[in-house]
Design a protein with these regions (language model features):
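C-terminal catalytic lobe of FAD-dependent flavoproteins
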Residues: 220-264
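A residue-level signal for conserved active-site and pocket-lining positions in enzyme catalytic cores
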Residues: 10, 28, 79, 122, ...
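Active-site/ligand-binding neighborhood in enzyme catalytic cores
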Residues: 1-96
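Conserved active-site loop/cleft motifs that coordinate metal ions or position small ligands
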Residues: 22, 213-216, 258-261
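Mid-domain catalytic core of redox enzymes
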Residues: 96-234
Length: 264
C-alpha cells in the first residue's frame, strides 16, 4: 500500500517488540532525527526507497561512504567561486520578505538595503522560512509549504566518552541512546552519539581523542569537555509532507518563485 505507515506495516506483518525497539526504530530515528511517534507515522514506501538508495538493505557489498576533505565548506567555496567567475553578484544580508510577481509586476526582494526587482526568485531555504518570507503566493503554494514542517534538533560537540557504549569494541560511528522506559508512543526526540573519529579524517593531533557529536542528548556532557553547541533544523517527512513533495512541481515557477532545499 503506497500510503501505509511504518506502524501499520509492522503491525500487519507481526514484527515483535524487540525488533522494533532494539533495532528498527533506533535505526530509522537516527537517520531522520525525529521522535519515535513521528517515525511510526512515516510512509513505509519512503523508508524502503531511502534504504535501497543508500545501500542499507544489503548485508554484503555495501557502498563505501566517502567524505570531502575540509568538509562541506569546500564545495560551498567552489560554488561561490563559480558564481563570481560568471559575474554573479553575491550579497550577504538578511532578506526581510519576498513579494511574488503578480499583475505584471516583477518579483521583489526586500532587504535592509532596499527593494530589488527580479524576473525569477529562487527560495533556497527551509519550507517554513519560505512560507514566512513570501507574500502574494496563492493558497495552493501556502498549503504545500505548510505541509512540510521543520523541527529543531540540539547538537553538542564534546569529548565525553561516557556517551559511548561501556564496551569499547561496541563503539560505532552512530551510537543510539534510549531511556529504559522508552515506548513506541514517545514524543522524545531520538538521541544519537556520532563518533567523528570513525566518520571524518581528523588531524593527527586529534586522532587519540574521541570526538563526539551528541544529537538531542538525554543528559549533559561534562561542561569542561564541551567544545560547541549548535541548533539544527531538519524536515519532518510524514505522510502529509510526502504528498506535498509530490505536488511541489505544480507551484515551481508560479508567480516567478522557485523552491529548493533538503525538503524538495
Amino acid at each position: 500500500e503506497p500510503d501505509e505507515t511504518i506502524a501499520d506495516f509492522l503491525d500487519r506483518n507481526h514484527f515483535g517488540r524487540s525488533f522494533r525497539e532494539n533495532y528498527f526504530l533506533p535505526m530509522i530515528g537516527a537517520i531522520w532525527s525525529c521522535s519515535v511517534e513521528q517515525m511510526l507515522e512515516f510512509p513505509i514506501q519512503t523508508m524502503v526507497r531511502f534504504c535501497h538508495n543508500h545501500g542499507l538493505l544489503q548485508i554484503q557489498n555495501r557502498p563505501q561512504w566517502l567524505t570531502i576533505q575540509g568538509g562541506s565548506r569546500e564545495y560551498v567555496k567552489r560554488i561561490v567561486r563559480a558564481l563570481e567567475e560568471s559575474h554573479v553578484t553575491i550579497k550577504r544580508e538578511n532578506v526581510l520578505c519576498v513579494n511574488a510577481a503578480q499583475n505584471g509586476v516583477s518579483a521583489e526582494v526586500i532587504s535592509a538595503s532596499g527593494v530589488a526587482s527580479f524576473d525569477e526568485v529562487v527560495m533556497a531555504c527551509h519550507s517554513d522560512q519560505a512560507l514566512t518570507l513570501l507574500h502574494g503566493i496563492d493558497q495552493e503554494a501556502q498549503n504545500i509549504l505548510a505541509a512540510i514542517p521543520y523541527q529543531k534538533n540540539r547538537a553538542i560537540l564534546h569529548t565525553d566518552t561516557d556517551f559511548l557504549p561501556m564496551t569499547k569494541r561496541c563503539w560505532a560511528a552512530w551510537n543510539y541512546t534510549a531511556q529504559s522506559d522508552t515506548v513506541p508512543t514517545s514524543k522524545q526526540h531520538v538521541s544519537v552519539n556520532y563518533l567523528i573519529n570513525r566518520l571524518q579524517p581528523l588531524p593527527k593531533a586529534l586522532q587519540d581523542t574521541q570526538i563526539i557529536v551528541s544529537l538531542n542528548p538525554s543528559s549533559e556532557p561534562k561542561p569542561k569537555l564541551v567544545q560547541q553547541e549548535i541548533q539544527y533544523s531538519h524536515p519532518v517527512f510524514d505522510m502529509k509532507a510526502i504528498q506535498a513533495q509530490k505536488a511541489l512541481p505544480l507551484i515551481q515557477g508560479s508567480s516567478s518563485i522557485w523552491y529548493c532545499g533538503a525538503w524538495t
